[in-house]
């Protein structure tokens, strides 16, 4: 038996921030990073909130939010006792807000509403039961999954993402594709998650190059924003796989941006997983659903078309090679493989990978990357 549930109310499109006008006479706590706290976007958010609200801001969020950041946030939440928490920013801010609210509730601190407002189009965190918290001392990222992590409300306003730089647009867009593809070949995939994943990927292949080159196009940004959420809904239900299990280690140990790490792994992982007959057929079906090959193409031709189009998409987005992305980390690569293998094997996202991966298979995959 498989289950499927949507627990977050969505508001999308230009002007969707206006839904916040319903919040009156509340203590609203905004969780974001320091850059956003000083940017015009925070004023745009403030302007959307009625003047009778009391607003507090927690802006100590860094990329890959840490355990310490979450602990600080819980302490502030205990002190402030807000009515509403708004996670505002990229995946790091949304993950931190969700984790802070979740852990605070376990201490008996309740809020009326948790709102997620993404300012990048990538993680899908606004509609998932997942968050990722880092331990910089150990170089490990911990993905957490719990239905209590779903935000109550998500707002997808494309005007909040038009200023995202091309490189970040590319990285986060490839994260969307990875979410869709891993959900599609997951052992927990269903007709419902397939539909979400297919639509998300179709949008990425069509609109991501335009979003990277013409970031001020609201229609394109809106499409990518929706794709991110569609893929988030897909993987939140179906799970992920070895791509994310390894990407978490590349982020934790080499500080590669998460979306970039996923993008650089993607075709290697497809080759790895396609040795499983079921996964190979699913990849072929995915390629046909995204119109990357003729409908009558055989599975091998469809699989090759998928790999070819992903490599083309990476080129269109001007992504670096794996070696260039690692920079000085290349010297430490070989010696860190054993620890990355062990951490990836323990990563919860590996549980729904279509091909079973043991330590030797994982090591072989990592060794071929560089």
Swiss-Prot record:
**Which keywords describe this protein according to UniProt?**
Bacterial microcompartment, Iron, NAD, Oxidoreductase
Location in the cell reads: Bacterial microcompartment
Which SUPFAM superfamilies does its entry note? Dehydroquinate synthase-like (SSF56796)
Which cofactors go with this protein?
Fe cation
Q: Which GO terms describe its cellular component?
A: bacterial microcompartment
GO BP terms: namely: propanediol catabolic process
Q: Does the keyword Lipid metabolism apply?
A: no
The pathway noted for it is:
Polyol metabolism; 1,2-propanediol degradation
Question: Where is this chain primarily localised?
Answer: other
Q: What is its EC number?
A: 1.1.-.-
**Subunit structure, briefly?**
Interacts with PduP, probably via the N-terminus of PduQ.
Protein name, entry field: 1-propanol dehydrogenase PduQ
UniProt lineage: Bacteria, Pseudomonadati, Pseudomonadota, Gammaproteobacteria, Enterobacterales
């Amino acid at each position: 038996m498989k289950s499927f549930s949507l627990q977050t109310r969505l508001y999308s499109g230009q002007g969707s921030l206006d839904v916040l006008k319903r919040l009156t006479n509340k203590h609203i706590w905004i969780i974001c990073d320091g850059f956003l706290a000083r940017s015009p976007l925070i004023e745009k958010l403030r302007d959307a909130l009625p003047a009778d609200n009391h607003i507090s801001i927690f802006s100590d969020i860094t990329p890959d939010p840490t355990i310490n950041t979450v602990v600080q946030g819980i302490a502030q939440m205990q002190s402030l006792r807000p009515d509403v928490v708004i996670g505002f920013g990229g995946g790091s801010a949304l993950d931190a807000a969700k984790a802070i609210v979740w852990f605070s509730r376990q201490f008996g601190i309740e809020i009326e509403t948790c709102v997620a407002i993404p300012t990048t189009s990538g993680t899908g965190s606004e509609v998932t039961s997942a968050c990722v918290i880092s331990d910089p001392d150990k170089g490990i990222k911990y993905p957490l999954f719990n239905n209590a992590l779903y935000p109550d409300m998500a707002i997808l306003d494309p005007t909040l993402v038009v200023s995202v730089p091309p490189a970040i647009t590319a990285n986060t867009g490839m994260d969307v594709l990875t979410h869709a593809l891993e959900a599609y070949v997951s052992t927990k995939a269903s007709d419902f998650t397939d539909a979400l994943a297919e639509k998300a990927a179709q949008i990425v292949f069509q609109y991501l190059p335009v979003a990277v080159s013409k970031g001020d196009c609201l229609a394109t940004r809106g499409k990518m924003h929706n794709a991110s959420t569609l893929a988030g809904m897909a993987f939140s239900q179906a799970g992920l796989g070895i791509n994310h299990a390894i990407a978490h280690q590349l982020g934790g140990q080499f500080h590669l941006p998460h979306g970039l790490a996923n993008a650089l792994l993607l075709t290697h992982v497809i080759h790895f997983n396609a040795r499983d007959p079921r996964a190979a057929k699913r990849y072929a079906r995915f390629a046909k659903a995204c119109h990357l090959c003729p409908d009558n193409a055989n599975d091998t031709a469809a699989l090759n078309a998928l790999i070819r189009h992903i490599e083309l998409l990476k080129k269109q987005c001007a992504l670096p090679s794996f070696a260039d992305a690692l920079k000085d980390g290349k010297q430490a690569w070989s010696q860190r493989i054993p620890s990355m293998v062990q951490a990836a094997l323990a990563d919860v996202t590996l549980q729904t990978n279509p091909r079973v991966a043991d330590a030797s298979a994982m090591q072989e995959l990592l060794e071929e990357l560089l």
